[in-house]
């Protein structure tokens, strides 16, 4: 047998005592674990699972007991007599044949149809106006060409080598500076700082 089947055979009192015992063991194991004295930490998980099974069995029994109690509720004599009389009336009266009931229902419907046609009016339907928003499209701006053109400057490099017994002279290179035109800089505006003079 499994553990759950064995536990279901026990009475409620035995299960309550088992719950108290398991809660005590669980507290003891957790205390030992906190102090580092617990050698088998898997015992905590086993106790928790067993405790869950026992509590589940107890709640099932409690719910079943409440359902059974509500199901077989005793009724008073007056309510019993009313129920019995209503069933007797339903059984004693014979329903009319199906064809007779259909014919009776059809006649009033035919008479009521012309009246309903005269009373109906057509509803006027107005078309909905859709609001359209006008969007202004700005023309694309083409980039303007630069007013100042860049000037190309050629640089000449001359190298002279002289072989002499005198100390060596460094080679002379003449490089002309290239002129490059960049965007004109914006003039910097100086801001004046106003200071309040103390009144005397």
Curated annotation (Swiss-Prot):
Segment Disordered: which positions? Answer: 92-200
Alphabetically ordered keywords of this record: Ribonucleoprotein, Ribosomal protein
Name under which the protein is recorded: Large ribosomal subunit protein uL29
Top-level taxon of the source organism: Bacteria
- Record has Ribonucleoprotein as a keyword: yes
Basic and acidic residues: compositionally biased ranges: 93-179
Q: Does the keyword RNA-binding apply?
A: no
Family from the record: Belongs to the universal ribosomal protein uL29 family.
Q: Where is the composition biased (Basic residues)?
A: 186-200
Q: Which HAMAP family match?
A: Ribosomal_uL29
A molecular function (GO) held by this record is: structural constituent of ribosome
Region feature Unknown, mapped onto this chain:
108-200
Stretch list, region Large ribosomal subunit protein uL29: 1-107
GO cellular component entries: cytosolic large ribosomal subunit
């Amino acid at each position: 047998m499994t553990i759950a089947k064995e536990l279901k055979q026990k009475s409620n009192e035995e299960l309550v005592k088992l719950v108290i015992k398991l809660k005590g063991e669980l507290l003891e194991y957790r205390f030992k674990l906190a102090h580092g004295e617990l050698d088998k930490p898997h015992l905590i998980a086993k106790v928790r699972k067993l405790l869950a099974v026992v509590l589940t069995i107890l709640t099932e029994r409690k719910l079943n007991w409440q359902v059974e109690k509500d199901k077989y509720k005793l009724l008073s004599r007056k309510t019993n007599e009313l129920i019995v009389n209503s069933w007797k009336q339903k059984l004693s009266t014979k329903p009319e044949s199906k064809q007779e009931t259909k014919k009776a229902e059809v006649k009033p419907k035919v008479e009521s149809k012309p009246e309903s046609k005269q009373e109906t009016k057509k509803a006027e339907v107005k078309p909905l106006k859709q609001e359209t928003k006008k969007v202004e499209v700005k023309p694309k701006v083409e980039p303007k060409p630069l007013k100042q053109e860049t000037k190309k400057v050629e640089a000449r490099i001359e190298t002279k080598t002289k072989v002499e017994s005198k100390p060596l002279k460094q080679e002379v290179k003449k490089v002309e500076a290239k002129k490059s035109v960049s965007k004109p800089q914006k003039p910097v505006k100086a801001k004046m700082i106003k200071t309040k003079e103390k009144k005397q």
